[in-house]
């Protein structure tokens, strides 16, 4: 355990020092094929992570070079994948700091390099200084990064369904973890969940409705949220579901 902010946002993770990551000649962004990894990772396994002892020890400036004195991360995309929705958050809320948390090393490397490339492209305007990605296990270390009542919004988009009953304990939504999420969420904060697996959706809804610190938004409230339309295909996984004409199951909950 060390006091750290995680991987620096401008660091190259997939090449030898001084060698640029392969980028597209058209977009100038890193090419995903160089960052392929298994679709899911075992969150219970003993991965080796550096993590801070407490939120005060996090070096946020290493991830957000333009962070203002006293400014805090407001939005957390848990299991951010390749960062599509995280980037959308940064564009929608330029005054808010958004963090993506991803357990898979190559995938998190890709997001870090993607953000670095976007920052270079937008250097004249200071674009994308408000988004960052951190490789960590959110199921274990979330309270090490965020203070009580710090977050305004948390996102769980297309999480690993862990179909086998014996692996249900690995699901990112369970009663114990919901209490941790409630701790770092401010009152009135929102938890957004989206999946293409109906069984997992029912599991999420059942567990969150059983928890005393959450209430589900009505359909009218959810539809009025400007973020809702972006949940369907801003992420790479969501876009794949749309292409395949799959189902989306949405549930948004308010912290009481």
From Swiss-Prot:
<keyword id="KW-0819">tRNA processing</keyword>
<feature type="binding site">
    <location>
        <begin position="235"/>
        <end position="237"/>
    </location>
    <ligand>
        <name>S-adenosyl-L-methionine</name>
    </ligand>
</feature>
<feature type="binding site">
    <location>
        <position position="157"/>
    </location>
    <ligand>
        <name>S-adenosyl-L-methionine</name>
    </ligand>
</feature>
<protein>
    <recommendedName>
        <fullName>tRNA (guanine-N(7)-)-methyltransferase</fullName>
        <ecNumber>2.1.1.33</ecNumber>
    </recommendedName>
</protein>
<keyword id="KW-0808">Transferase</keyword>
<keyword id="KW-0820">tRNA-binding</keyword>
<dbReference type="InterPro" id="IPR003358">
    <property type="entry name" value="tRNA_(Gua-N-7)_MeTrfase_Trmb"/>
</dbReference>
<comment type="pathway">
    <text>tRNA modification; N(7)-methylguanine-tRNA biosynthesis.</text>
</comment>
<feature type="binding site">
    <location>
        <begin position="137"/>
        <end position="138"/>
    </location>
    <ligand>
        <name>S-adenosyl-L-methionine</name>
    </ligand>
</feature>
<feature type="binding site">
    <location>
        <begin position="102"/>
        <end position="103"/>
    </location>
    <ligand>
        <name>S-adenosyl-L-methionine</name>
    </ligand>
</feature>
<feature type="region of interest" description="Disordered">
    <location>
        <begin position="1"/>
        <end position="22"/>
    </location>
</feature>
<dbReference type="InterPro" id="IPR025763">
    <property type="entry name" value="Trm8_euk"/>
</dbReference>
<dbReference type="GO" id="GO:0106143">
    <property type="term" value="C:tRNA (m7G46) methyltransferase complex"/>
</dbReference>
<dbReference type="GO" id="GO:0008176">
    <property type="term" value="F:tRNA (guanine(46)-N7)-methyltransferase activity"/>
</dbReference>
<feature type="active site">
    <location>
        <position position="160"/>
    </location>
</feature>
<dbReference type="InterPro" id="IPR029063">
    <property type="entry name" value="SAM-dependent_MTases_sf"/>
</dbReference>
<dbReference type="GO" id="GO:0000049">
    <property type="term" value="F:tRNA binding"/>
</dbReference>
<dbReference type="Pfam" id="PF02390">
    <property type="entry name" value="Methyltransf_4"/>
</dbReference>
<comment type="function">
    <text>Catalyzes the formation of N(7)-methylguanine at position 46 (m7G46) in tRNA.</text>
</comment>
<keyword id="KW-0694">RNA-binding</keyword>
<keyword id="KW-0489">Methyltransferase</keyword>
<keyword id="KW-0949">S-adenosyl-L-methionine</keyword>
<keyword id="KW-0539">Nucleus</keyword>
<feature type="binding site">
    <location>
        <position position="79"/>
    </location>
    <ligand>
        <name>S-adenosyl-L-methionine</name>
    </ligand>
</feature>
<dbReference type="GO" id="GO:0005634">
    <property type="term" value="C:nucleus"/>
</dbReference>
<feature type="compositionally biased region" description="Polar residues">
    <location>
        <begin position="1"/>
        <end position="15"/>
    </location>
</feature>
<comment type="similarity">
    <text>Belongs to the class I-like SAM-binding methyltransferase superfamily. TrmB family.</text>
</comment>
């Amino acid at each position: 355990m060390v006091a750290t902010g995680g991987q620096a946002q401008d660091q190259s993770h997939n090449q030898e020092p001084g060698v640029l990551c392969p980028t597209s000649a058209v977009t100038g962004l890193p090419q995903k094929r160089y960052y392929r990894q298994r679709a899911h990772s075992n969150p219970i396994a003993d991965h080796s992570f550096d993590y801070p002892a407490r939120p005060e020890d996090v070096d946020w400036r290493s991830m957000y070079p333009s962070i203002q004195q006293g400014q805090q991360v407001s939005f957390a995309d848990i299991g951010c994948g390749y960062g599509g929705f995280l980037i959308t958050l940064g564009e929608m809320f330029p005054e808010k700091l958004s963090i993506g948390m991803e357990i898979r090393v190559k995938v998190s490397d890709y997001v870090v390099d993607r953000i670095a490339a976007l920052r270079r492209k937008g250097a004249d305007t200071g674009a994308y200084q408000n988004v960052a990605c951190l490789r960590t296990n959110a199921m274990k270390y979330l309270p090490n990064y965020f203070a009580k009542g710090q977050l305004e919004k948390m996102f769980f988009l297309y999480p690993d369904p862990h179909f086998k009953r014996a692996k249900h304990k690995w699901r990112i939504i369970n009663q114990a973890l919901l209490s941790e999420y409630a701790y770092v969420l401010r009152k009135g904060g929102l938890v957004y969940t989206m999946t293409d697996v109906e069984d997992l959706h029912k599991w999420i809804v059942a567990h969150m409705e059983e928890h005393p610190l959450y209430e589900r938004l009505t359909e009218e409230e959810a539809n009025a949220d400007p973020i809702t339309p972006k949940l369907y295909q801003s992420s790479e996984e969501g876009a794949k579901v749309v292409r395949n004409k799959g189902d989306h199951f949405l549930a948004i909950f308010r912290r009481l």
